[in-house]
Amino acid sequence: AWEYADKLLIVSVMVAGDSVIEQFTPYKDGVITSRKTFQKYYAQSEFRSFVETTLGDDAIAAGQGIFIVFKDKVEEQQFLLQRQHVKRDWNQKTQRELKTRAASTEALKKNIVDKHLDLFTDFWETALDLGRIPANNEFEFSDQIRRVAGSHNKAHQVLLSHFGDGLFKEAQKKRKEDLLVYFALGLFEKRKPKTQMPESLKRDIKAFYNSYNDALEEAKVALFAVGDPELIEKACNKAHDILQCGEMLEGHSYIFHKDYLGDIPPELRIYIGCATQLYGDLE
């Protein structure tokens, strides 16, 4: 299967703990079930080791008993990067910013935006999603926006005048947190430094860090920090204050819905991400 695979291979098995396996009759490296059939159960770590040893490559946990192995390492990075790219809804905040700044926006710039509102809104939301000005191939209507505004940079400046820079600065902060989590989890997985990477990641590094090495150094500090129980406890309290939901058990745990994962402090995202890499996604 690995020889035939072009970009990736997904491998899955049945996973069970000792409490389940003990219910059956041991037989060689598996068990005999109540239906008198042979079944081999794996522990998550055992299966990862088997896959990586057999294929001689890194395996990424996608769930309990499910691992993905990438032949295409650029695709692998793109997959891992997308895992940490939180899709945030900027629309409500954009509308709020628009109302507060409508009166102060320069008439000429306001006229341009109002005349092509859907186009500029799409561009603005793309910029907020990326936390930076999108490259030409990162915005679906690049040709149209460049015809109207001259360039992506000029369109962005018009929109900053229209909406203000507060929301964009917030988007930059959030996107850099996504990248910090991505790089920290890459270090946790002990993945080798990449000689090839997606073009979008190269742009991210250029926009948010001085260099790739700077990104790794910052991620290393963040990764080691999550080994401090006091820091995690403070992060849980902060997350509870931010989300205003979930179950906080003082000195023990904080339980919240995984849909809010992108809204919690980055150190807590890294902490959870380490567990996810070991045991699979939070499904």
Q: Locations of the language-model features?
A:
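A short glycine-rich, Lys/Arg-flanked "PGG" loop and its adjoining helix->strand segment in the class I
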Residues: A1-L9
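Class I S-adenosyl-L-methionine-dependent methyltransferase catalytic core
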Residues: W2-E3, I21-F24, S49
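Conserved class I S-adenosyl-L-methionine
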Residues: I10-I32
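Short alpha-helix
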Residues: R35-L55
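Functional cation/ligand-contacting sites centered on basic and imidazole/sulfhydryl donors
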Residues: S49, E75-Q77, L81-E283
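Conserved S-adenosyl-L-methionine
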Residues: G56-F67
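Conserved beta strand-loop-helix elements of the APE1-like EEP
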Residues: I68-E76
